[in-house]
């Protein structure tokens, strides 16, 4: 915190609480125009650091702020990084690991510089304002155990939807302040004829392309009120797509034999066009992008 009537500050940082000046790793660091100092190279994981700041006023009189300390946690990723200097761009890379329940940030050199720690936060996407969106894993005992969230480095979870659906791939904040996400929906459908037919018939299904007997999983776009978290608008593929249009070539019905449900649409992105008041839905298993009128 800034001290009044001071013109500049000098920072010392050490791992030795008894001799911060003499055993410093950041020594006599001059800080004037900003109260922010970013050290990119000398801070390591699993360490305790001690710091003090000397504030100087216009008369060159000093006042010591501190001593204080902070801890760094443990790294969470276990990766090997190959750096191609001619190809990389400046900046940081944030990613989420869905089945390991964490998010992390790496710098240009592949060094892990932040992670979600003991919060099981999974990064999905960001927006032009730099806000982060994703999901939180809340345990296997919940029916919908990945509620969609907005989160930040500083505060962790800042908003969370009510958890009445499985929110996957995409969630973000609309210009009106509400949140919109990509969930799932289910309906009963046929098992169409194909090379998988004997497999399903061996399980006791008719599998004749006519009998409504098998679980189809589709996608549902959901908008929540930012304050009440009430679902105020939705769009479901089962209300608009023809179930006779499905992928018969990609092996999805063989996967359905093992999982007990047909992954019909498998959407992996939604995008909002404010100028056109429209939502674009990318349905991977239908090889289709759909433009949807938004109220």
Residue ranges and their predicted role:
Residues 1-4:
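Conserved aromatic anchor
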Residues 6-46, 58-66:
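Recognizes extended acidic, P/S/T-rich segments that occur
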Residues 57, 67-295:
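Histidine-/acidic-rich catalytic cores in large beta-rich domains
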């Amino acid at each position: 915190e800034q001290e009044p009537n001071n013109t500049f500050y000098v920072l010392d940082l050490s791992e030795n609480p008894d001799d911060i000046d003499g055993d410093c790793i950041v020594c006599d660091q001059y800080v004037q125009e900003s109260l922010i100092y970013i050290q990119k190279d000398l801070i390591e994981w699993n360490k305790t650091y001690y710091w003090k700041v000397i504030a100087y006023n216009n008369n060159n009189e000093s006042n010591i702020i501190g001593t204080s300390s902070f801890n760094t946690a443990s790294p969470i990723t276990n990766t090997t990084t190959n750096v191609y200097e001619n190809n990389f761009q400046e900046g940081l890379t944030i990613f989420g690991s869905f089945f390991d329940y964490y998010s992390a940030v790496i710098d240009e050199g592949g060094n892990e510089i932040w992670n979600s720690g003991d919060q099981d936060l999974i990064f999905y996407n960001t927006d032009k304002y730099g806000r982060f969106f994703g999901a939180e894993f809340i345990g296997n005992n919940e029916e919908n155990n990945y509620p969609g969230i907005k989160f930040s480095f500083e505060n962790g979870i800042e908003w969370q939807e009510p958890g009445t659906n499985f929110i996957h791939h995409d969630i973000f904040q609309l210009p009106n302040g509400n949140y919109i996400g990509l969930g799932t929906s289910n309906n009963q459908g046929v098992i169409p004829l194909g090379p998988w037919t004997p497999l399903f018939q061996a399980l006791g299904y008719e599998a004749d392309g006519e009998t409504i007997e098998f679980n189809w999983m589709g996608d549902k776009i959901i908008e929540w009120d930012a304050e009440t978290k009430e679902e105020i608008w939705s769009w479901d593929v089962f209300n608009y797509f023809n179930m006779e249009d499905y992928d018969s070539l990609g092996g999805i019905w063989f996967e359905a034999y093992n999982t007990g449900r047909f992954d019909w649409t498998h959407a992996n992105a939604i995008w909002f066009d404010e100028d056109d008041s429209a939502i674009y839905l990318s349905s991977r298993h239908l090889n289709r992008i759909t433009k949807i009128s938004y109220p």
